[in-house]
């Protein structure tokens, strides 16, 4: 009788559906850096890698993650890729903030910059921006070459002071107003002539923004996060 019961139990166990294991969020005593790469850069941190690495080195006990999104222009099309990035970023921020007490840092380049600022403030035909209560967990945000750059904002940085990006936010609009509520923890770097953030013709200006301003961005982040 006992042997039969044991065999039945084993058979039932073997045929049961596998149990999904809960994925636990890793928390850091330093900061949790989320890096969002630019268009058509290989999966991972892309051009933001140097900034992310410097932050990790400067703030002990920190960790990082590369935003998992298409970062594409044509397949899928740019707007869909940005939307995918927004949803992924909001999910990462909410998951970390719900599970951990540490601070979050956001770093984005080009399309990745667009993803970050749209996640914060919304955009045309984009998902609802993240609940501002979650941004209380974000200590610093630095973006480079953001196509939605709008000149004349207090958080603007770089050499461009007169031109807007190719997807600039509307002056006086709700999106730009919401983005300005995060001005104390945000820097948006854009240089004169940049094809995307300054509607210029200098492709090298776009690619040189992180090499030019990366150290300044790290100093800004460290000043707000330690």
Model features per residue range: what roles?
Residues 26-28, 98-99, 115, 132-136, ...:
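Extracellular/periplasmic catalytic domains that process cell-envelope and extracellular macromolecules
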Residues 153-226:
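C-terminal catalytic-base region of ester-bond hydrolases, centering on the histidine
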């Amino acid at each position: 009788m006992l042997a039969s019961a044991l065999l039945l139990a084993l058979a039932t166990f073997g045929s049961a559906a596998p149990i999904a294991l809960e994925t636990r969020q890793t928390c850091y005593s330093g900061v949790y850096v989320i890096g969002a790469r630019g268009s058509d850069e290989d999966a991972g941190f892309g051009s933001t890698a140097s900034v992310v690495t410097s932050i990790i080195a400067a703030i002990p006990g920190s960790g990082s993650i590369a935003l998992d999104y298409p970062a594409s222009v044509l397949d899928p099309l740019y707007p869909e890729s940005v939307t995918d990035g927004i949803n992924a970023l909001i999910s990462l921020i909410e998951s970390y903030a719900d599970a951990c007490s540490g601070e979050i840092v956001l770093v984005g380049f080009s399309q990745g910059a667009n993803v970050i600022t749209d996640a914060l403030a919304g955009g045309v035909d984009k998902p609802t921006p993240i609940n501002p209560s979650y941004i209380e967990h974000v200590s610093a945000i630095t973006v480079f070459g953001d196509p939605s750059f709008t000149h004349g904002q207090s958080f603007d940085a770089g050499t461009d002071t007169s031109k807007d990006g190719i997807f600039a936010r509307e002056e006086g609009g709700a999106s730009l107003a919401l983005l300005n509520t995060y001005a104390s923890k945000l820097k948006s770097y854009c240089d004169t002539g940049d094809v995307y953030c300054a509607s210029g013709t200098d492709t090298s200006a776009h690619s040189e923004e992180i090499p030019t301003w990366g150290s300044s961005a790290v100093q800004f982040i460290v000043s707000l996060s330690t």
